[in-house]
Amino acid sequence: MDEHLARHRLADLFLDTFAFNAHTTATEALWVGLPVVTKLGKGFAARVAGSLLTAIDLPELITETVEDYEALILDLATNPERLAAIKQKLAENRLSKPLFDTELFTKHLEDGYQQVYQRYYDGKLPEAIVVPTQHLLFANHQ
């Protein structure tokens, strides 16, 4: 596994695919400190990397158009100071944000389940829920 994860350290950026985002591979890249650039799509499979980046508080790496995706990649590739700042933020956030903090992630998930159940119990129709916390969690990029 160490060799598998070490390969990410050879890259400067992880460029996500559009129709089907990286799932485990993007998570592994973030774990070892490799920034992931993604473009949100419409379906679940095209929004996974955006959720991962939101959960680690790096929304600046989420784009919504191909043009913005390309521009962000070019900016990061030609601006080593900005890329270094993002890598530093990723390193700082790795163990303090919900993505890799299992206890915090579980608390947020449980809070979400409580909201869903309460809506059901109150006879309300399903709708998108937001788990309010002091930390950034799965922002509504739609």
Which residues fall in each region the model found?
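Short acidic loop-to-helix transition motifs that present clustered carboxylates
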Residues: M1-E3, A22
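C-terminal amphipathic helix plus adjacent low-complexity
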Residues: A6, L72-Q142
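Catalytic binding pocket for nucleotide-activated donors in carbohydrate/polymer assembly enzymes
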Residues: H8, T17-T102
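An anion/phosphate-binding loop that grips the pyrophosphate of nucleotide cofactors and donors
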Residues: A11
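Receiver (REC) domain switch-region micro-motif
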Residues: F14
